[in-house]
Amino acid sequence: MRNYDLSPLLRQWIGFDKLASSMQGSQEPIDFPPYNIEKKDDNHYRITLALAGFRQSDLDIEVEGPRLTVKGSPAPTEKAVEYLHQGLVFKPFTLSFTLAEHLHVSDAHFENGLLHIDLVRDVPEALQPQRIAIGGGRPALNQQPAEDA
């Protein structure tokens, strides 16, 4: 029997909360850059990438169809450095996310080495569930209305 870990895959799909029950498979985890995906409520999400050492000019965010892509290319250093220990990574990266229908980027800002990308779900009013009022006092379809006496 095979066990599938969907968590690495689901991190790449934003706004598909019921995706786990309909998908099988796995994907190699992405380890750079580290990121969080927050669900604030049913219509608001935030992706936060930890990008210490990057500048805002090193980053590019692009949306094409349902695909959100974040690219980073750090500027080359002018002098060679001999590291005794290198724990900080400065390497180019490309990170892509597939957005659910009606989900779009509302804001992006870079502050203190963190890139925040805010997402909002805007479902058109025609597609939103509508509440139907339940009336009373009407006869059923198969019954004749009572005659006034």
From Swiss-Prot:
Gene Ontology biological process: protein stabilization
Pfam family, one: HSP20
Annotated SUPFAM superfamilies: HSP20-like chaperones
InterPro entries xrefs: A-crystallin/Hsp20_dom, ACD_IbpA/B, HSP20-like_chaperone, HSP20_IbpB
Domain sHSP: 26-137
GO CC aspect terms: cytoplasm
This protein's UniProt keywords: Chaperone, Cytoplasm, Stress response
CDD domains: ACD_IbpA-B_like
Compartments, as annotated in UniProt: Cytoplasm
Keyword Kinase: no
Record-stated family: Belongs to the small heat shock protein (HSP20) family.
Record's subunit section: Homodimer. Forms homomultimers of about 100-150 subunits at optimal growth temperatures. Conformation changes to oligomers at high temperatures or high ionic concentrations. The decrease in size of the multimers is accompanied by an increase in chaperone activity.
Function description: Associates with aggregated proteins, together with IbpA, to stabilize and protect them from irreversible denaturation and extensive proteolysis during heat shock and oxidative stress. Aggregated proteins bound to the IbpAB complex are more efficiently refolded and reactivated by the ATP-dependent chaperone systems ClpB and DnaK/DnaJ/GrpE. Its activity is ATP-independent.
HAMAP family reported in the protein's UniProt record: HSP20_IbpB (MF_02001)
Domain description: The N- and C-terminal flexible termini are involved in oligomerization and in the binding of non-native substrate proteins, and are essential for chaperone activity.
UniProt-recorded name of the protein: Small heat shock protein IbpB
The organism of origin for this protein: Pectobacterium carotovorum subsp. carotovorum (strain PC1)
